[in-house]
Amino acid sequence: MRLGSSRVAEWIVVFGFPARPDGRPTPELARRIAAAALAARRWPEARLLVSGGPGRRSPAEAAVMAQRLRAHGIGPDRIVEDDAARDTMDTVRAAARLIPRGTAVVAVTSAYHVPRCVALLRIAGLRARGLGATAGRRMGRAGWLYWTLRELPAVAWDVVLALWLRAMGRFGAA
């Protein structure tokens, strides 16, 4: 996770990950929350969009993230919750509806997920860069292979879908 950029971020878009049924964040979600808190302190004027709906047996990811960010000292007036998003594309479409085109945003998510999120936010017309929440331990070859095989088709699918939605005027940009 690197925060060295001097470029301004007007919005921080935090992509969700399932919470535990009792409302506590999973380790993956906790890393994203910690990275978002660091980014919020780095860019104190930036607003945060936390995104993610409820799971089958867990509360909305956005609510869990917002509560934890407030516990990290991030003001509630800076946090916008999107509790309807079911996946990455839903989060990007919510960002495109809320944030004006050309706005500088930082996508906070897991490191393996950054390329897809940044590409989609850029297709949505936002000036995006990513901040990957690093794992607490090394992923290893099996983990790397799993996430690579998972993300490659997802990137291809989502990019094609985003380009089609944009061409049809249905991407939702502000």
Write out the residue ranges for each language-model feature.
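Active-site cores that bind ATP or allylic diphosphates and position pyrophosphate for catalysis
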Residues: A174
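A transmembrane-helix-recognition feature enriched in membrane-embedded lipid enzymes
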Residues: R141-F171
